[in-house]
Amino acid sequence: MIIYKDEVFGFFEIFNEENGTLFRSDINGVDPVMRSFPELLDVGIMGHCNGGQYCRNAGIDCYQKGFTTYAPHMSYENFMEIVKQAAGKTFQIALGGAGDPNKHPQIEDILKSCRAYRIIPNMTTSGFLITDNEVGLIKQYCGAVAVSWYSRFMDGKESNQETIDAVERLVKSGCTTNIHYVVSKDTINEAITRLEMDSFPKGVNA
């Protein structure tokens, strides 16, 4: 358990590192309206994407422009500056950017450092070309992982088996696995059908 007391806005929090449960209570009888420092940080460590046109080929545009952007990845040193400033105040860091965080060349060091400073790392990935080593690192260090859903029903079959395989591998390894499903006018009907038919892979958390 991590206990955080916000002296400015007069409340305290208790965060369970094992399951992500957060309790917040006021001290002075007034509901807190904000926090002195974010409890969760979204940190874009990826400057470009290894997947190329993978998302677009699945009919989904990348909001990070990963298919046209080629910037350098965030350095481990710069990431550590963020972690050190957040230590003791931030409970979780969501790793992202213009690509899959598990493909960052120093992802193991990044995940280990988060845990060393008692910050829980999480990430979203396409699952494209995910390796057994990456699955193991996610299982060991991450609170949860979300897989971007890049598969559609076509003639009663999944259009992208790689997405299905990635979800199933993460679930089988014991990772808390969620699905990142982009709902739009083109996907809403299929999303409803999938929920009604319970057609997502078994064992996903949310």
Predicted regions and their residues:
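Flexible, acidic/Gly-rich N-terminal and inter-domain linker regions that tether
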Residues: 1-42, 57
